[in-house]
């Protein structure tokens, strides 16, 4: 009976290790695919595999965030008004996710300042006032100076 339990436990462990390695291999493939598209400046093709990896395993590699910023900036510049607002919000969300997943590589003040600059650049599209944007910059300055 003990041997039977041991065999079941070991087989379960082997199956779970195989599943984890398969997932890791899929992540490596997706990273390779979208990074090659980004290097070739084919951001539209890079978007789908990048988003899949970002949602599934954001801690896998910091390139998700570095290349993701390039992809979203391209999408912002080359999209219609409604989509543009979604991509702007997604870029701000991406920076926050980078801060959460890679805190040593991402100082909070930098993220807040980048977000405030993004809001300033697209103030009219986001229906924001100068006062709203000023408050964001002020918050970034206060947070970074602490």
Where are these predicted regions, by residue range?
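Bacterial Sec-dependent N-terminal signal peptides
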Residues: 1-25, 69
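Post-signal peptide N-terminal segment of secreted/secretory-pathway proteins
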Residues: 24-27, 32-146
